[in-house]
Amino acid sequence: MREPDFLNHFLKKGYFKKHAKAVLALSGGLDSMFLFKVLSTYQKELEIELILAHVNHKQRIESDWEEKELRKLAAEAELPIYISNFSGEFSEARARNFRYDFFQEVMKKTGATALVTAHHADDQVETILMRLIRGTRLRYLSGIKEKQVVGEIEIIRPFLHFQKKDFPSIFHFEDTSNQENHYFRNRIRNSYLPELEKENPRFRDAILGIGNEILDYDLAIAELSNNINVENLQQLFSYSESTQRVLLQTYLNRFPDLNLTKAQFAEVQQILKSKSQYRHPIKNGYELIKEYQQFQICKISPQADEEEDELVLHYQNQVAYQGYLFSFGLPLEGELIQQIPVSRETSIHIRHRKTGDVLIQNGHRKKLRRLFIDLKIPMEKRNSALIIEQFGEIVSILGIATNNLSKKTKNDIMNTVLYIEKIDR
């Protein structure tokens, strides 16, 4: 194929119609170098300002030399280039996260709204097969998205309909580590795919066909369920269990960076079936909020997180707060659940310390400031310590000390339990 053929495809698809500035992820491999050539040659026709971004993973001797060559290439093309060096223990996942964090920084700095990557059809086949082997959810078997909006940016993969063999042989850097089978993707590319193609020479086309079919089903379900308010639990639960699962999965497609595992999805389902109000951190900065017959998934707000001064928890309710799950009168299962005797007669307040706070110990009121000094509690831990209060008295300083009322008084007043579980944030 000739370069104008790729240009015509880009124009027909309208990839850059909404964008004035685009960042190209430039690895130096054949696919990204050819994409660089097409985009830099036809900037005017595509009406974009091109910005280059490269990550030096520091995993090969040649990587520093390649970085210098890419700087020269950018200078010759009179294009800006941003480069970052990966450090720390290397893994595919850590490197990928590092790259995308860096690309977003570049976009924020330059005002670009599109990130362009050179993923092609061969990458798509490998990705779908990897996910299938790992046992991912069906909707993820549609593979890499051609266009994907994440927050305020759009990721564009204009080569996704082309195979690597469609690209002309031009100057590029060959990563010799791609021939090693140390990483899963390399084993897919070098070992598994060739063996499967012996059974079916059109295996790659078959995998791509399955991915496209799953994508069609996803889009059709989204369109057909457009008038269903999934966040209304009364409406959601009016359908069969199977339909509920599909509707909930379709709803989760609204949050492309959430990516719940099967176990996490099952946990969300269980929470939605609970009768109590609920606030639960899920993953990647999202939380699930359930209030009676309504729920929503949203980014954790500062008010609901570390900056909240005081939280009020009512009987038969649960709430996630600053890395803990508090359950008032509703038992939690697990080996590391803390239990604090409390009363069901009034709400519980969870907060940080205040000037003048006291705790009753051995029948005596002791100021928290003196207690912290006696226990040699570091200042940082003093400031972050969570205070559990009821009836205007401190019941517990989480993980540090508890109000030790007499047994008779405790039995008379404390007629239920506050369950506390440490959770990941």
Curated annotation (Swiss-Prot):
One term under GO cellular component: cytoplasm
Naturally occurring in which organism (per UniProt): Streptococcus pneumoniae (strain JJA)
Protein's name in the database: tRNA(Ile)-lysidine synthase
Main localization (coarse): cytoplasm
Domain notes: The N-terminal region contains the highly conserved SGGXDS motif, predicted to be a P-loop motif involved in ATP binding.
Catalytic activity field: cytidine(34) in tRNA(Ile2) + L-lysine + ATP = lysidine(34) in tRNA(Ile2) + AMP + diphosphate + H(+)
GO BP annotations listed: tRNA modification
Keyword tRNA processing: yes
Coiled-coil intervals, chain numbering: none
Family membership noted in the UniProt record: Belongs to the tRNA(Ile)-lysidine synthase family.
Keywords recorded for this protein, A-Z: ATP-binding, Cytoplasm, Ligase, Nucleotide-binding, tRNA processing
GO MF annotations in UniProt: ATP binding; tRNA(Ile)-lysidine synthase activity
EC nos: 6.3.4.19
Superkingdom per UniProt: Bacteria
Gene expressing this chain: tilS
HAMAP family: tRNA_Ile_lys_synt
Residues annotated as binding ATP: S27, G28, G29, L30, D31, S32
Described function: Ligates lysine onto the cytidine present at position 34 of the AUA codon-specific tRNA(Ile) that contains the anticodon CAU, in an ATP-dependent manner. Cytidine is converted to lysidine, thus changing the amino acid specificity of the tRNA from methionine to isoleucine.
Keyword DNA repair applies: no
Classification via CDD domains: TilS_N
